[in-house]
Amino acid sequence: MCGIVGYIGYDNAKELLLKGLEKLEYRGYDSAGIAVVNDDNTTVFKEKGRIAELRKVADSSDFDGPVGIGHTRWATHGVPNHENSHPHQSSNGRFTLVHNGVIENYEELKGEYLQGVSFISETDTEVIVQLVEYFSNQGLSTEEAFTKVVSLLHGSYALGLLDAEDKDTIYVAKNKSPLLLGVGEGFNVIASDALAMLQVTSEYKEIHDHEIVIVKKDEVIIKDADGNVVERDSYIAEIDASDAEKGVYAHYMLKEIHEQPAVMRRIIQEYQDAEGNLKIDQDIINDVKEADRIYVIAAGTSYHAGLVGKEFLEKWAGVPTEVHVASEFVYNMPLLSEKPLFVYISQSGETADSRAVLVETNKLGHKSLTITNVAGSTLSREADHTLLLHAGPEIAVASTKAYTAQIAVLSILSQIVAKEHGREADIDLLRELAKVTTAIEAIVDDAPIMEQIATDFLETTRNAFFIGRTIDYNVSLEGALKLKEISYIQAEGFAGGELKHGTIALIEEGTPVVGLATQEKVNLSIRGNVKEVVARGAHPCIISMEGLEKEGDTYVIPHVHELLTPLVSVVALQLISYYAALHRDLDVDKPRNLAKSVTVE
């Protein structure tokens, strides 16, 4: 959600900033802009819409310089337009700012300090940059003014500030919003994500909340909230830039769907010891063993993965498990058990709602485990333990390979804990995950069939329903989410038995209903639910599993262990959703109004 880049060094900044913003497109945005400093002049280029439009405007000018900042905006305060786009400038044009996050007290600050100031935009960001000018006019240095303003802000922010009279510095601060320092020889950068600046460096330093950072081309000074200089080691971002390219695929989403077999193999390799046994850190095992209840905290697709993980944790490991939507949990925490363990699932490791819960549970002294795709992310740093997904960069807004990776890692965790508890395993998990990998490959190879299903069932519809029972119900929720995210079809997932309690009233002639039938004990029941909607005119699409199929089923997935079917059936739903959006000529990778990493609450 939004993205920031910045460069200070020896090279011209404009092209580096534009390329950096292009690498952040996956985060979701509705406008973009850059600001470049040369001598004592700052020039701002910004446009509503895609970065391609911004590039046209920026390339039409010869102005360039060795210092600059850039921003992709996902609207929170004010509609998407040119005036509300970042960067924002102070009234005298001296200060230029980019900001990710939400300032909760901006109206109060505006009323207290900025009476009579004329504002161009509706944003909270413009209040920040006008405050810097205000305190500068009171005689404070730029660093002092910036520090003073940051101390007044309530909410989340990642900030990058330029001063036209001090072209050798970018002033930086953050709180509850991701921002990194990139380190180079004779230059330094800032970025919301290491991917943005891999073009120039792979060496990064973390910025912690409430720190003030002075970035120059040949040094970086980090100060804590008390003004003390902080020494911090750098690390190498272990990301292959080629992993973030589409390669031969038309879209990132299609590429990432096709990568799932490789991701499964990587997970099997990473969580297996030399003797071929499952392995994770013993400290994690101990904390899970000691927990009397697990609370899974997540949002969106990660929440759906958590619902599947609950099945593993309870059925295999024997640990009572609850799955909660992060944005609700933080305001409505239930009565907790005596020895809870909190498991945070987040592809990016930056989900603001989940982080808000983690902050509260850390205050209570509860143990925590993050399952994420990004080492060094906020949730990873602030939790007691981390399990990595090893899925590689996921660029498409609609999550695919992270979902299956999350489920696979949860299955491994559950089996290891089951063994520690002395519970009999009814599954050779590594062997079964290998079967899952082969099954996913078979479905990916059947992409033309999925395209035909999408055409037959979803090309013209405005509504669709996904139904399942037991673990299939959890997958139906994810299938519906994928379809609505990228095709804009109103899609909902329901437990099969709940249709008759209200939803069946929405069924009319031709309404597509996707029924998942991969569970033997409810196979007849879910098929009965399909018959109920067919009797009312629905257009049924049944996805079943080998051994449970019936004549007339639309697609049959290869046979795998019944609790691992979500890893396989969801791939069919991902492809169907992809082709439904493709045939509607929609932007599959960057659907409207959505952001990849939701970094505001």
UniProtKB/Swiss-Prot annotation:
It catalyses: D-fructose 6-phosphate + L-glutamine = D-glucosamine 6-phosphate + L-glutamate. Pfam families: GATase_6, SIS. Residues 284-423, 453-591 form the SIS domain. GO terms for cellular component: cytosol. It is found in: Cytoplasm. GO terms for molecular function: carbohydrate derivative binding; glutamine-fructose-6-phosphate transaminase (isomerizing) activity. GO terms for biological process: carbohydrate metabolic process; fructose 6-phosphate metabolic process; protein N-linked glycosylation; UDP-N-acetylglucosamine metabolic process. Keywords: Aminotransferase, Cytoplasm, Glutamine amidotransferase, Repeat, Transferase. Transmembrane segments: none annotated. Residues 2-218 form the Glutamine amidotransferase type-2 domain. Its EC number is 2.6.1.16. Catalyzes the first step in hexosamine metabolism, converting fructose-6P into glucosamine-6P using glutamine as a nitrogen source. NCBIfam families: glmS, PRK00331.1. Homodimer. This is Glutamine--fructose-6-phosphate aminotransferase [isomerizing]. The gene is glmS.
